[in-house]
Amino acid sequence: PTTGSVEATLEETYFNRTPDHFCSHQHTPNNPGADRAGAVLTKNTGYIVWNVFHDYADKGSYHLKELVLHMIDNLLGDDRSVKVNLPDRGIVTFTKQEDESRYIAHLLFAHTSKRGANIEVIEDIIPLCEIKLDARLPKAPKRVYKAECEDGKIVTTDLDYKFENGVASVDVGKVTMHAMVVFDI
């Protein structure tokens, strides 16, 4: 029994396959009624009872990624510092530069191609369009702009934003591999 919300269950098999216990299928059928909590959420904790990150790295099962994201989203609720609609290979880092009175969101996306066992290379730069960013800030920014490198020079573009309930919402537009969104406070 658990006091939290069960987000996923583990279903036990009738038996484990061994030379003595054989099943003609790759997996032995599940034993109805022999299930148990596999992922549990409480108000401030989340627990997954198996090595989900190893399993995801090994097998790449989409449902494992979705389970982890679901649990993180539920734990963070409205308290997340940043949210962006980058695709799954996208990376966002959100930093505070106190001396400059600003926050910076670095948006990064590169489509990689696998070459060999453990090598991923970037061969094509694919721009992303209609990128949207929400950033939690202590107060409304004085200015929001995108900073990008073009031909070795930093180019800035002012961005319109909406500030409600401590969150600045920005339509970043196009991102080609990397862009910085700067929030001057």
Regions found by a protein language model. Give the residues of each.
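A conserved amphipathic helix/loop scaffold
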Residues: 1-174, 179-181, 185
